[in-house]
Swiss-Prot record:
Keyword Manganese: no
PANTHER family attached to this UniProt entry: TRNA(ILE)-LYSIDINE SYNTHASE-RELATED (PTHR43033:SF1)
Binding-site residues, ATP: 32-37
Root EC class: ligase
Protein name: tRNA(Ile)-lysidine synthase
GO biological process: tRNA modification
Cited InterPro entries: Rossmann-like_a/b/a_fold, TilS/TtcA_N, tRNA_Ile_lys_synt, tRNA_Ile_lys_synt_N
Record's comment describing the protein's domains: The N-terminal region contains the highly conserved SGGXDS motif, predicted to be a P-loop motif involved in ATP binding.
Gene name per UniProt: tilS
Membership in a protein family: Belongs to the tRNA(Ile)-lysidine synthase family.
Leader sequence residues: none
Length: 346
């Protein structure tokens, strides 16, 4: 990214930032009224105006119903959108709100509403205003939780979610540059007090960033870690694809369930774990399994195979995880959907 960390984003830079989405039919801009999303709207509008042909832009604000100021902020976004010749609509998160995990629940609701709006408007993409600062904080949060390589890759520039493509054109732009962009354009913005609420993890980690930066662990370094983790994760996913194909080839023409256990356990531990994650996600009915539990499963499979003879019909391990049944029987590793739990209404 050219320019210092406190310079306004130029029109030339904006063209580069948004260039990947020039051919999109329509794009929804997720704008809350805060500095990052207002800068996204301002830059996207200028970029689109400079194109002879390009995507239709529409602005969507989600009011979570959690702050009384949110309605006024949505109206302010609507006024600015109108001045930029952009259509705007406000969507509201209705219904009961959870007493715990409110931020995660609000985030999930926001993405669902944005995806629904995109489909209604015929938009292929939803753009959000995540910045370099957000990416660094995400890496720090995942480091603190002991995430694997995929987790440390943090947010992708593009990812499919809820049937639309979520795009983050500002992911390598410092927040300070977006604030400078608004100052230059004389655009006022709102501040969400929850972004500084110490009850939540992200604001607490944000407070630590200056101290970490003084030790060399600044946003740029954390984002560099995310880039390298993403590169390693992509390579490991390719290796996992190859391993999956290899295991399938061993049983070509056979109707035997599962895979060859000896061949599976001969793979590198990381590839075993990724194959288990894939298969459990495919056959389980309780959502994606926790990485730590899958790591424990891989270790249990290895120990079971090592200590017991491979009698043809001998069950050496059987357990359930994430709504799937895993069994190591003879020389076969089989993962199938678990039966519904007794008393559960389905």
């Amino acid at each position: 990214m050219s320019g210092t960390d406190h310079e306004a984003v130029s029109a030339t830079e904006a063209r580069r930032l948004f260039a990947d989405w020039k051919a999109a039919p329509a794009i929804v801009l997720a704008v809350s009224g805060g500095p990052d999303s207002l800068a996204l709207m301002w830059l996207a509008a200028r970029w689109r105006k400079a194109l002879k042909r390009g995507p239709a832009l529409a602005v969507v604000t989600v009011d979570h119903g959690l702050r009384p100021e949110a309605a006024a902020e949505a109206r302010a976004v609507k006024r600015l959108a109108a001045s930029l010749d952009l259509p705007h609509r406000t969507l509201r998160w209705s219904g009961d709100k959870p007493s715990t995990g409110i931020q995660a629940a609000a985030r999930g609701a926001r993405y669902r509403l944005l995806a629904k709006a995109a489909k209604t408007l015929g938009a292929s993409h939803v753009m959000t205003a995540h910045t370099r600062d957000d990416q660094a904080e995400t890496v720090l949060m995942r480091l603190s939780r002991g995430s694997g390589i995929a987790g440390l890759a943090a947010m992708a520039r593009e990812i499919e979610r809820d049937g639309v493509v979520l795009a983050r054109p500002l992911l390598d732009v410092p927040k300070a540059r977006l604030i400078a962009t608004l100052a230059k354009a004389r655009i006022a913005f709102a501040t969400d007090p929850s972004n500084a609420d110490p009850r939540f993890t992200r604001p607490r980690l944000r407070e630590l960033m200056p101290q970490l930066a003084a030790e060399g662990c600044d946003a740029r370094s954390l984002v560099r870690l995310a880039v390298r983790a993403a590169r390693a994760d992509a390579a490991l996913e390719l290796m996992t694809d190859g391993a999956e194909q290899f295991l399938a080839s061993l049983d070509a023409g056979s109707e035997r369930p599962g895979v060859n256990a000896r061949a599976f356990l001969g793979l590198a531990a990381e590839i075993q774990i990724r194959l288990l994650l894939r298969t459990l996600s495919r056959h389980g009915h309780e959502g994606p399994p926790e990485l730590g539990k899958v790591e424990a499963l891989a270790e249990a499979l290895s120990q079971a195979a090592a200590r017991r003879p491979q009698a043809a019909a001998k069950i050496r391990l059987k357990q359930t995880l994430a709504g799937a049944v895993i069994s190591l029987t003879g020389d076969r590793l089989v993962i199938v959907p678990a039966p519904p739990r007794r008393g559960r209404v389905r």
